[in-house]
Amino acid sequence: MNKLDLNLKEVHNELVEFLRENFKKAGFSKAVLGLSGGIDSALVAYLLRDALGKENVLAIMMPYKSSNPDSLNHAKLVVEDLKINSKTIEITDMIDAYFKNEKEATSLRMGNKMARERMSILFDYSSKENALVVGTSNKTEIYLGYSTQFGDAACALNPIGDLYKTNIWDLSRYLKIPNELIEKKPSADLWEGQTDEQEMGLTYKEADQVMYRLLEENKTVEEVLAEGFNKDLVDNIVRRMNRSEYKRRMPLIAKIKR
């Protein structure tokens, strides 16, 4: 049995109940999420439909001019399948207006700005619709630091933040999410041709096996290496986990003597 295998029916029920319970506690009945065309946000959309009903879910698609056309098409597949409310807001003018005077901007800076622009739109619609912003980052991304602080990582609650990427794929198959989204190469689509795995220098499946041992089984690096995992891979993962710890906590506040 694969260490990452889950009882998918139980997990689905657990996540749906998590959403219902926490929306009720917060006094909200509606949700808003960014629908990118990737599998993570698609899965969250399906969970929200099951938890709140299709009429209470607003999916916002926010393409930039360099976004892969497949991303928007795949997002629309989800909207059509779930029959949820949706809106498309182009962010090209907003991003280009800012970078007009920043000619030396790197792809990373532009990608982070796009993520934060999308966050800003989601929270504005949260106010407009009296809805909670629901996050779409998985556990693998969160612990590798593969997110933009106060960008795609910003949300009121996140139903998939304890699921590794492997779990995301498995649960998506269980829920019969369109296969095009499951089989495509994971990409934040922040610039043309970008893929997550190429950028990080690892595969999600490899990372999940290592991270499961470190985080769930509390094994040391030495114990993980003793199981035969590649040292460069493990070092890459541990370095990313350590370097991104600040993203996983609230801002540090200096305490003064009184």
Swiss-Prot record:
Q: Which UniProt keywords apply?
A: ATP-binding, Ligase, Magnesium, Metal-binding, NAD, Nucleotide-binding
Catalytic reaction(s) noted: deamido-NAD(+) + NH4(+) + ATP = AMP + diphosphate + NAD(+) + H(+)
* EC code: 6.3.1.5
Pathway, per UniProt?
Cofactor biosynthesis; NAD(+) biosynthesis; NAD(+) from deamido-NAD(+) (ammonia route): step 1/1
The UniProt GO MF terms for this protein read: ATP binding; glutaminase activity; metal ion binding; NAD+ synthase (glutamine-hydrolyzing) activity; NAD+ synthase activity
| Function in brief | Catalyzes the ATP-dependent amidation of deamido-NAD to form NAD. Uses ammonia as a nitrogen source.
Query: Can you name this protein?
Result: NH(3)-dependent NAD(+) synthetase
Question: What is the organism lineage in this UniProt record?
Answer: Bacteria, Fusobacteriati, Fusobacteriota, Fusobacteriia, Fusobacteriales
What gene is this protein a product of? Answer: nadE
